[in-house]
């Protein structure tokens, strides 16, 4: 099954012809993902799926979904989960409802399954072994992202704001020792993360998995991102306050009430509050490091 799925999907994914969304989190099953309730019952050559997924990024534009479903209720929670593919987001019984974020964006959704059928052949790995597949995938999701290019770009944005904004009417914000110190701390965090990322890339090129280092990367990357967002909003002050989500839409050409950077600073700040939660909260990542790396 796995090899057929690779042949069917991987070339189209690489070519950018199809997009998958990820069906993991559920209402009440986020950080405690193994408690998920979405059920798949075998019916001949199909699974019949009922339940719901939430915070599903891009479900409204995706072609397919990979998701975790419960196929057994006995034993440990982790032992009754399977990893399946949904061939089409237009499958009968599958409904996508938007969730608009605090920033006014539609990025995430709630997905409902009402007797949705998917072939048993779309299962990845053995039945009831989906937890192992999901953990492997999350290891690369946390450690496979290159945080530093985005963080360096964001750092330069904040520096540019600080060079242009006055501080209490005397000089520029960039010259304020306290603010400059926090910028320097953020840059050190990024440089440290960059070294870790390069080490992980080196390991991957040798066929090694990132292991618990991926949890360290996720913690440092997401917390540094939030630190920069906070500095950006602080530097812009009231310029970051206006709520103009339409100004960030493709094709919008009306004048805005604040400078360009003021349009994105607060939405980034609000959206990235979730960076320390998704893909496994940072508290969970610290638990993983404590158990797997430190043996605590």
Description of each model-found segment:
Residues 54-59, 102-103, 274-281:
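Glycine-rich phosphate/pyrophosphate-binding beta-alpha loops
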Residues 1-2:
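Short, small-residue-biased leader/transition segments that mark boundaries at the very start
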Residues 38-40, 155:
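A structural signal for short hydrophobic beta-strand segments in well-ordered beta-sheet cores
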Residues 167-170, 191-255:
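C-terminal helix-coil-helix/basic helical segment that borders enzyme active sites and/or dimer interfaces
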